[in-house]
Amino acid sequence: MCHRSHGRSLRPPSPLLLLLPLLLQSPWAAGAAEKHNSAGVHYATAYWLPDTKAVEIKMVLDKKGDAYGFYNDSIQTTGWGVLEIKAGYGSQILSNEIIMFLAGYLEGYLTALHMYDHFTNLYPQLIKNPSIVKKVQDFMEKQELWTRKNIKDQKDDPFWRHTGYVVSQLDGMYLGAQKRASEEEMKPMTMFQIQFLNAVGDLLDLIPSLSPTKSSSLKKFKIWEMGHCSALIKVLPGFENIYFAHSSWYTYAAMLRIYKHWDFNIKDKYTASNRLSFSSYPGFLESLDDFYILSSGLILLQTTNSVYNKTLLKLVVPESLLAWQRVRVANMMAQGGKEWSQLFSMYNSGTYNNQYMVLDLKKVTLKKSIDRGALYVVEQIPTYVEYSDQTNILRKGYWASYNIPFHKTVYNWSGYPLLVHKLGLDYSYDLAPRAKIFRRDQGTVTDMASMKHIMRYNNYKVDPYSKGDPCSTICCREDLNEASPSPGGCYDTKVADIFLASQYKAYAISGPTVQNGLPPFNWNRFNDTLHQGMPDVFDFDFVTMKPILT
């Protein structure tokens, strides 16, 4: 299904390459590796050659190597690719920056072909007007130069040191993908294109901030277009278990998925989590969804809050850290929810404005107590981040998240009161369709099967709260909208509980819901939307995700 022509050019035109750290300016690859164009499990090990500052790749699984792992290209059969990488556990003693660089290099090498596909699919979804490309490039170049300068100038600051680890990983991904492209005789992706992929969430707000548009009818607004999602944390009545789940909403052009398991041997006293499992995409060094299980005992979920107050978007500046970067740094450094919130709040870009739920499983003693600090809720808008401990609400049974701000200040500044005035209570926090459905049905969750069920729920033809709208429900199917079908909506679900999380284990399903007899999504109805590398039909079951490397 996926056609790759030799020497194929990628959009947009290459910008000036941005600066890379000094170590990347040496010859960066050595050795040959066999080509892989087909599905299957592909093993690889990266070796750091310190004398030449080069990387050698061998298609073996060598635990003495500096980074090793595999990519299971099973997208056509399960809807998911699976990537697992361990770095820094080899025979060499390496700096944290080199460990992160090699982890990124190996991921870029193993997943380069799907990175190309994913960029091809997403670029036209975000760049509707070619005139915006130069503005985006200029902003991202300024933001990167500002970030790298702070990393260089503040090496003794733990926050900026960890930001440097993330940037090293990105540099490695770029060069690893470049190495793979040269072997496949493809034109390599530029650094801007890889930055573009990682910033997809941020671009949802950055592009409108750079391109003022005339006011349009709010009635034409499609909630899934901004990457909206549904999330639920459910506590059983006697605190016997705590479940957490997330269902992503966005364009179906984003359905090229990779579930990732990382284990990086970072030696830094300020690093709280160096092992994590999360849902993700090709070329992304973050989840985007978000759904993370962290070795610190934290769980991170997220849903997007739109900013209807366009004046706020004018306050976005490049001298800031993008949301994906701040999430990664907070994930690495935070021991608890409050610390995560404080770290995430630093250098707020005002892009990818979300509600984050930080669940601290260390604060949960089953059948006994859920201690203060177990749930922090964090919300961002341009110039402002608010967070609060909402454990008390969680103790009462559940926390639901459905793309409407919880904190009053964020709700008001984002423009929701005007939206409610113009469009009705469907946009209010308490009486949005998903608020009502979660309130009604969360009590039916008693086990993993019922948790999966509520997160895939769509009974729009019958449910009075849906009023016949296939997106006024937990798992949206905008492609079934009779008036104006679009290939977008809810396209996955990830579910786990406190027991599974201790093993970095989750259940994940890829594709739009087929609950209550809904037809499986088929691309043949929407062939005008690029979907390179994807299955034609999405009708998959839940898959067990669990790391297996030792």
Curated annotation (Swiss-Prot):
Exhibits weak phospholipase activity, acting on various phospholipids, including phosphatidylcholine, phosphatidylinositol, phosphatidylethanolamine and lysophospholipids. However, in view of the small size of the putative binding pocket, it has been proposed that it may act rather as an amidase or a peptidase. Transmembrane segments: none annotated. Its main location: other. May form a homodimer, each monomer is composed of a chain A and a chain B. Residues 210-228 form a propeptide. Residues 1-39 form the signal peptide. Disulfide bonds join C471-C476, C475-C490. It is found in: Lysosome. Glycans are attached at N72, N309, N412, N527. GO terms for biological process: phospholipid catabolic process. The maturation cleavages that produces chains A and B are required to open the putative substrate binding pocket. Both chains A and B remain associated in the mature protein. Belongs to the phospholipase B-like family. This is Phospholipase B-like 1. Pfam families: Phospholip_B. The lineage of its organism: Eukaryota, Metazoa, Chordata, Craniata, Vertebrata. One of its GO terms (molecular function) is phospholipase activity. InterPro entries: PLipase_B-like, PLipase_B-like_dom1, PLipase_B-like_dom2, PLipase_B-like_dom3. GO terms for cellular component: extracellular region; extracellular space; lysosome. It is an enzyme of class 3 (hydrolase). Keywords: Disulfide bond, Glycoprotein, Hydrolase, Lipid degradation, Lipid metabolism, Lysosome, Signal. It comes from Rattus norvegicus.
